[in-house]
Regions:
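Bacterial N-terminal signal peptides that target proteins for export
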Residues: 1-7
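Hydrophobic helical h-region of N-terminal Sec-dependent signal peptides
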Residues: 7-15
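Flexible, solvent-exposed loop/hinge segments and secondary-structure transition points
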Residues: 22-165
Length: 165
């Protein structure tokens, strides 16, 4: 008797969860555009580096194009070597999934279904990866590593100010 009731409860829960997952609407993500140009990447890096240095943070800043290929990388003297791969990973993650890495971090922190992101290849669920948009299209992304997640995000967003120059 109890195994049948338990089976019924489990099946009901699974059906309820699958319906709610399937009914979720896919967000509107920006389309990919032409790859970022080197001179634009350099302007973004300069703004990001200035923000990091202003705060005394040692960081690595990476720019990738709309295909996730490295365009430019800056490592502030004394930054840990591990941040090189992490900054590139954050930038690639932002481009590949067409969203800031903070969105991934928030999903993982919320738990539940968001935890499955941890097992996906190329996901860096840490703040510090931001899309670089031009005319509403993704031309690349910036990835920053070396500080706390919030510091990495602050420097990445400061770098985006380089688009305005």
């Amino acid at each position: 008797m109890y195994p049948k009731i338990l089976t019924l409860i489990v099946v009901s829960i699974l059906l309820t969860n699958s319906r709610s997952v399937m009914s979720q609407n896919q967000p509107n993500f920006p389309d990919y555009g032409n790859p970022i140009r080197l001179e634009v990447a350099k302007k973004i890096i300069l703004k990001a580096e200035a923000e990091a240095k202003k705060n005394g943070w040692k960081m690595v800043i990476s720019i990738v194009d709309s295909g996730g290929n490295l365009v430019y990388l800056e490592r502030i003297d004394g930054t840990q070597f591990g941040s090189i791969d992490i900054s590139q990973g954050k930038a690639k993650c932002a481009v590949n999934f067409r969203r800031p890495t903070k969105a991934m971090e928030d999903s993982v922190v919320a738990g539940g279904m968001g935890l499955r992101l941890i097992g996906l290849p190329g996901v860096y669920p840490l703040e510090g990866g931001e899309l670089i948009l031009l005319d509403g299209k993704i031309i690349g992304a910036i990835g920053v590593s070396g500080g706390t997640s919030a510091q990495d995000g602050q420097v990445a967003r400061a770098g985006l100010e380089g688009l305005k120059d």
